[in-house]
């Protein structure tokens, strides 16, 4: 029987909502980098999704340095898990930030005054280059990321390990990791908390940075009028480089969170997740930081609820139906504002 005609279950609705918000927050984390760059230089950086993918492969490589694999991570000591995650949290954002700035300096900087189609096509080209680097780095098949978070939950949360009778039962193992207790019909794990615990503070910090710091005010000046900003003594190239660095770092944080929660990496993942992130940025109002988060949450809910009640086949199409409907009534997105351009 199709999911649409299944008996309605309020607990299932709640669980799908929780899962949708988790995925939406993850999409929002990637979308923040998209909207940050577009808000300053009006460039749709289609390579952003594949930059996120390379960050995932670097996180996988960091696990390899410490000998962590899917088969051995359960026996790893807590200190090794903590050091691995800590090193990934530092190295991956730095790597993505440096790579993003390098691409800007080598590719986008020379196209600042070119027609807008030129940097757009160049971004698509960079995306294909990154995708092939990912293919060379990790191969053509999906690679399982070590379940570092699950292995550490027994230590951090104090949950009892599954008994021998239930050790092979994934359902029973999941129940032991539920923060609401093993008998709760709703499941909230540390994966859910991790995604929100990273996305929401980063959104708040980014908003405060743009609105209240000197560099943030310089970014807004460059976004409004680059020529006038230069006349006021603002180093626009430096501001744009900082913007790309922040956007890349956000992609890197998204990479770490994604690998810890999804546990699967492949070279094509950047395109799909990048498309979701771009859609979230447009849906919320591209260039608007809270809008990117709101757009990501909407996409996560539509995807999760659509998969549960309509069918996974149609969930992707439903996301873009929602996007079209919202843009028909609000062309600037949910939180976007109308801006008049003088000629």
Question: What is the role of each PLM region?
Answer:
Residues 1-30, 58, 69-86, 114-118, ...:
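Membrane-interfacial amphipathic/re-entrant helices at transmembrane-helix boundaries
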Residues 5, 40-102, 106, 165-172, ...:
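Membrane-embedded helix boundary and interhelical linker motif in transport proteins
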Residues 2, 11-12, 224-231, 235-238, ...:
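Cytosolic-side transmembrane-helix boundaries in multi-pass membrane proteins
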Residues 3, 111, 119-211, 305, ...:
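Transmembrane helix-bundle core of multi-pass membrane transporters
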Residues 71-126, 133, 294-299, 330-331:
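Alpha-helical transmembrane segments within multi-pass membrane transporters and channels
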Residues 187-265, 289-294:
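Helix-loop-helix "hairpin" substructures at the membrane interface of multi-pass membrane proteins
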Residues 13-64, 102-118, 281-289:
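Single transmembrane alpha-helix segments in multi-pass membrane proteins
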Residues 8-26, 209-214, 240-287, 304-317:
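Inter-helical junctions in multi-pass inner-membrane proteins, predominant
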């Amino acid at each position: 029987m199709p999911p649409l005609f299944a008996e309605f279950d309020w607990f299932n609705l709640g669980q799908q909502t929780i899962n949708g918000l988790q995925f939406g927050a993850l999409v929002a984390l990637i979308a923040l980098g998209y909207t940050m760059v577009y808000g300053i230089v009006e460039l749709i950086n289609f390579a952003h999704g594949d930059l996120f993918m390379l960050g995932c492969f670097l996180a996988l490589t960091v696990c390899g340095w410490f000998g962590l694999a899917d088969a051995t991570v359960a026996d790893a000591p807590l200190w090794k898990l903590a050091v691995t995650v800590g090193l990934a949290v530092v190295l991956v954002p730095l790597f993505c930030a440096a790579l993003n700035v390098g691409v800007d300096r080598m590719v986008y900087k020379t196209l600042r005054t070119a027609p807008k189609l030129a940097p757009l096509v160049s971004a698509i080209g960079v995306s294909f280059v990154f995708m092939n680097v990912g293919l060379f780095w990790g191969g053509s098949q999906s690679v399982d990321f070590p379940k570092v978070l699950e292995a550490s939950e027994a230590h951090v949360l104090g949950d009892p390990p599954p008994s021998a009778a239930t050790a092979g039962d994934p359902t029973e193992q999941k129940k032991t990791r539920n923060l609401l207790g093993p008998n709760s019909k709703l499941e909230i794990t540390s994966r859910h908390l991790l995604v929100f615990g990273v996305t929401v503070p980063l959104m708040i910090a980014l908003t405060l940075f743009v609105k209240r710091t000197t560099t943030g005010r310089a970014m807004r000046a460059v976004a409004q009028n680059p020529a006038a900003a230069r006349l006021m003594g603002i180093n626009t190239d430096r501001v744009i480089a900082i913007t790309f660095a922040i956007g890349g770092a956000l992609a890197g944080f998204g990479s770490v969170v994604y690998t810890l929660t999804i546990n699967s990496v492949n070279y094509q993942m950047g395109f799909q997740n990048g498309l979701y992130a771009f859609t979230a940025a447009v849906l919320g109002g591209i260039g608007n930081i809270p809008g990117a988060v709101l757009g990501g949450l909407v996409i996560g809910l539509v995807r999760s609820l659509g998969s549960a009640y309509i069918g996974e086949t149609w969930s992707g199409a439903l996301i873009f139906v929602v996007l079209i409907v919202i843009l028909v009534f609000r062309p600037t997105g949910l939180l976007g504002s109308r801006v008049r351009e003088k000629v």
